[in-house]
Design a protein with these regions (language model features):
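N-terminal catalytic cores of secreted or lumenal carbohydrate-active enzymes
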Residues: 18-249
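Noncatalytic carbohydrate-binding groove/subsite architecture in carbohydrate-active enzymes
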Residues: 193-334, 341
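Aromatic/acidic polysaccharide-binding cleft in carbohydrate-active enzymes
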Residues: 309, 313-399, 403-416
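Carbohydrate-binding surface patches
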Residues: 410-448, 453-456, 490
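C-terminal beta-strand-rich structural cap/linker in extracellular carbohydrate-active enzymes
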Residues: 471-498, 666
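Short strand-edge motifs at loop-to-beta-strand transitions and within beta-strands
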Residues: 480, 558-562, 654-658
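Proline-enriched interdomain boundary motifs that mark the N-terminal boundary
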Residues: 499-507, 598-605
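Enriched for extracellular/lumenal, surface-exposed ectodomains of secreted and cell-surface proteins
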Residues: 566-588, 662-682
Length: 689
């Protein structure tokens, strides 16, 4: 990373900033190492056993698969053979005096770095020393890496930000051989002079490195223009065109260091006000156009060359952003935007610094650039993630090696990314860059029914601003859109729900009308009994149509019981179901046949024998069911026809009475026509006269 203050440019992310394309981008197949981090030889975390043991699992959890080694300006002062650098040299030292006067030993040598990288499952991307090194020193490194198991390097870069005056070793009394027109304490050479010098000397490096390993992948620094806040120069096209035209045949990639801002502390170098959090987050909207510029130049000189983002961050200076939720949103948008545009990998600068030595949370978080804190005493405290780590962690759900990543069309302030992962599952990231308002966005149409939702929101945070809330939903539930809190990231990933099971039985498969049907069932979730209080629905169905829905909750052990009285005779199906966002649906059916019951119909006369002309009371008793039921009472005098003497609805007791004058032997009959529960019936009584 740069150590000098550059001329300030307009703040990206403000009004008029470039935005992403209005349509979905073409899916890009991600490399084997899309997610990277910069680690320098002086790194105090990765070189300390206790710190390493704390950080490595977190790097694995976030899917880091590249380490960019040798570290910013240190790269051009670092001797990999002695594991020393010259960063503490006072001004005015001669080149010959370096090793004797001011050598500094580093803790993280190449062997240990390689061991840690292989444990992480990461590739190594190394920058060789172009400042105080030589082609032979670089070639020896390449040879050892190729010949030593576990020390392989996937990509080699010649020099760090060699287009910038801050890399000219201006404190020297005499220059290294590869720096042209050097004047001690004098002005920086022009971009053209620097580019021509680099093209010649970098060619010498390439020749030596290729001789050591013909398969070595070698890259060079890419210079942004001054419209980019950090690691940028005027006349950048002179640098890029000169190098690519001269050495393009041997260049496998360019290394672009992207810092959209150049502020640190309370103001940027020009004294301007710091950008707002929203401006910081929305600065990533420039990335598609910046990548297009790089690719356009490469297509002219070296179409096969790849683009590596060897360093990135909000600014090349320490800021408060890594303490804030904006740091997570920026980091996620940064890495996903570059990868979706076509970058081979994106490396955050740096893993850690010496800034947050006593960190306990946001209350004492110091301005920083890093992903992790560096505890003053590893024996009593462990490195803690800062918010850029959270951004990479969330982005890793999409940025899998071999995935097909695309940036979907932007919806207002919402950035949208979709990744088809190896195996076919789909993941989506939605970033609401608006820090003041919630926004609604759609997630595309490729998601499976069951989804895991990870939400990182500035408005719902813990004391370290690293809280990610995890819930579950379905594609159907968010088909019309998902509401994103202000300043938030929502990541949707497909999931395979846990299994569930259900049984359902009844006391009998056949019951008489008017009788309760008692059903018992059991619900299991992921092979174990469901806890008490889980809701189960039981539908009473006829011919596939639901007549009624009963809701019941499980008891301890997963059992449940429900009772019902079917409204009529016939065949019924009771369908029990359980639906959730966590488990697969569970269903169970049970068939019940309801048959008609015989009514308890009786008929009685007030007397069995009377004198002719005597009035008798004839009473019919229906019994259950008797509410609103109609009976018909007949009288048939001996030798005469059967006649209706009363047709009426029974009273509340289920009875119907009639007074009849008996003149001769008479037979009384009562009939019930039947209904949906009961069969037709009749009863008779005789009176002699």
């Amino acid at each position: 990373v740069t150590l000098a203050v550059l001329a300030a440019a307009a703040l990206p992310g403000a009004a008029g900033a470039a935005t992403s394309a209005p349509s979905d981008s073409t899916p890009v197949t991600l490399s084997a190492s899309p997610l990277g981090v910069d680690i320098a030889p002086w790194d105090p975390v990765y070189s300390t056993t206790a710190n390493f043991n704390a950080v490595q699992p977190l790097l694995k959890a976030a899917g880091f698969n590249e380490i960019h080694y040798s570290g910013g300006v240190t790269a051009d002062q670092y001797d990999w053979q002695t594991d020393t650098d010259l960063s503490n040299c006072p001004a005015g030292q001669t080149f010959a005096d370096f090793s004797a006067a001011c050598v500094t030993s580093d803790a993280l040598d190449f062997s240990l770095l390689s061991q840690h990288a292989r444990d992480l499952g990461a590739q190594t991307f190394a920058t060789v020393n172009y400042g105080t090194g030589t082609p032979d020193l670089a070639a020896a490194w390449v040879a050892q890496a190729a010949a030593t198991p576990g020390q392989q390097v996937s990509d080699w870069e010649i020099g760090n930000e060699s287009y910038g005056c801050w890399m000219e070793d201006e404190w020297l009394a005499d220059p290294p051989a590869n720096i042209a027109d050097y004047v001690p304490n004098g002005p920086c050479p022009t971009t053209a002079v620097m580019a021509n010098s680099y093209a010649v000397h970098a060619g010498d490096y390439m020749t030596a490195m290729k001789a050591a390993d013909p398969n070595a992948q070698i890259g060079v620094p890419w210079a942004f223009d001054n419209g980019v806040g950090g690691a940028a120069v005027a006349n950048n096209t002179t640098w890029n065109d000169t190098i690519l035209q001269a050495d393009g045949a041997d260049i496998s990639f360019v290394d672009a260091h992207w810092y959209p801002f150049s502020f640190g502390g309370n103001t940027d170098p020009a004294g301007k006000k710091n950008p707002s959090d929203q401006q910081v987050i929305q600065s990533v909207m420039q990335i598609p156009s910046e990548y297009a510029k790089i690719r356009g130049t490469l297509n002219t000189y070296d179409p096969g060359a790849q683009v590596i983002i060897g360093e990135t961050g909000v600014s090349f200076l320490e800021t408060g952003v890594p303490c804030l939720p904006a740091g997570a949103l920026f980091a996620a948008g940064d890495v996903l935007s570059w990868l979706a545009a076509g970058a081979q990998s994106v490396n955050w600068w740096p893993l850690d610094t010496n800034t947050n030595l006593d960190y306990t949370g946001t209350s004492n978080c110091q301005q920083d650039e890093a992903m992790f804190t560096n505890p003053r005493n590893p024996a009593t405290a462990s490195p803690r993630p800062l918010t850029p780590y959270v951004g990479y962690l969330l982005a890793s759900a999409l940025a899998k090696p071999g995935a097909q990543l695309s940036e979907l069309s932007q919806q207002g302030d919402v950035l949208r990314f979709q990744s088809v992962l190896p195996g076919g599952k789909v993941a989506v990231a939605l970033i609401n860059t608006n820090t003041g308002s919630a926004k609604t966005a759609t997630a595309g149409s490729s998601l499976s029914p069951y989804l895991t939702v990870q939400t990182y929101s500035a408005g719902n945070q813990n004391s370290t601003n690293t809280k990610i809330a995890t819930t579950a939903t379905t594609a159907a539930a968010i088909a019309s859109g998902i509401t994103l809190p202000a300043e938030s990231i929502v990541v949707l990933t497909q999931r395979t729900p846990k299994p569930s099971g259900m049984s359902l039985t009844a006391t009998s498969a056949t019951v008489k009308a008017g009788t309760k049907v008692t059903l018992t069932g059991n619900l299991t979730l992921n092979g174990a009994a469901a806890p008490a209080g889980v809701s189960v629905k039981v539908n009473r169905q006829v011919g596939g149509r639901t007549q009624a829905t009963l809701t019941v909750k499980t008891a301890a052990g997963g059992g449940f019981t429900v009772t019902d009285i079917p409204p009529a005779t016939g065949s019924y199906t009771y369908a029990a179901s359980y639906v959730s966002n966590t488990y697969l649906p569970a269903t169970a059916n049970h068939a019940v046949t309801v048959t008609a019951a015989k009514p308890a119909l009786k008929l009685a006369a007030s007397a069995k024998s009377v004198k002719p002309g005597t009035k008798v009371t004839v009473t019919a008793s229906l019994g259950a069911p008797h509410v609103n039921k109609t009976l018909v009472i007949y009288a048939q005098v001996k030798g005469g026809a059967k006649k209706v003497i009363k047709r009426a609805t029974v009273n509340a007791k289920g009875q119907l009475s009639v007074v009849f004058t008996v003149k001769a032997n008479t037979t009384f009959t009562v009939t019930f026509a039947g209904d949906t529960w009961y069969t037709a019936g009749s009863a008779a009584a005789a009176v002699k006269a």
